[in-house]
Design a protein with these regions (language model features):
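Intrinsically disordered, low-complexity regulatory segments
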Residues: 6-31, 36-179
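Proline-centered turn/helix-capping motifs that create local helix->coil transitions or kinks
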Residues: 1-5
Length: 179
């Protein structure tokens, strides 16, 4: 009606569809996307809302902005489950070429218990890592004797407190070695 965007014929030429879907904010960049089709797949990482808006404003102000200049506004993906991105080379490759390997590690702390044993407390997990699956996998590795020094693993996460995966260590285990 308002002639906002161009239209093109759909896959079977039966009707016209918009070439883009206008929006007030860059939803795809903010929310990310993951999908598989015949012969191709896509994974777009989510980004911070305010950084994304700043990036859009910078692009509007300078249509010839370079990717490096744009990355001063949109610095890196922003994962809803937290975690720490290790190395920016993968992020830079993803921004420049649409492909890149981004390594994300969870956040953890080591706590000493009253009985002298230590616990590893995981408070953030990488994006799309299921906490129950993580807990089960650690348990499997302990049972297979691939990892030694762990006496118990428990997922104490909840909606109120957030992520909390507790790994109890055996008395002689050294947390920094297991990490």
């Amino acid at each position: 009606e308002k002639d906002t965007v161009d239209f093109q014929l759909n896959f079977d030429d039966s009707e016209k569809e918009p070439t883009v879907l206008p929006t007030r904010i860059p939803n795809l960049l903010i929310n990310g996307s993951s999908g598989i089709a015949v012969g191709m797949a896509t994974n777009m990482m989510p980004h911070n809302l305010s950084e994304s808006i700043d990036g859009c404003i910078a692009y509007i102000d300078n249509r010839d902005i370079t990717i490096d200049e744009l990355m001063q506004h949109v610095k890196a993906p922003d994962f809803p489950t937290g975690g720490v991105i290790y190395g920016m080379e993968g992020v830079k490759a993803a921004m420049h070429f649409g492909r890149g390997r981004v390594v994300v590690r969870g956040k953890l702390t080591v706590e000493a218990k009253a009985n002298g044993k230590e616990q590893i407390i995981i408070t953030e997990v990488p994006y799309q890592v299921n906490r129950d699956a993580l807990t089960n996998r650690i348990g499997e590795l302990v049972n297979e004797k691939t990892i030694e020094g762990i006496s118990h693993v428990n997922n104490e996460s909840n909606n109120k407190e957030g992520t909390r995966v507790v790994i109890d260590l055996k008395k002689d285990a050294i947390a920094n070695v297991l990490i």
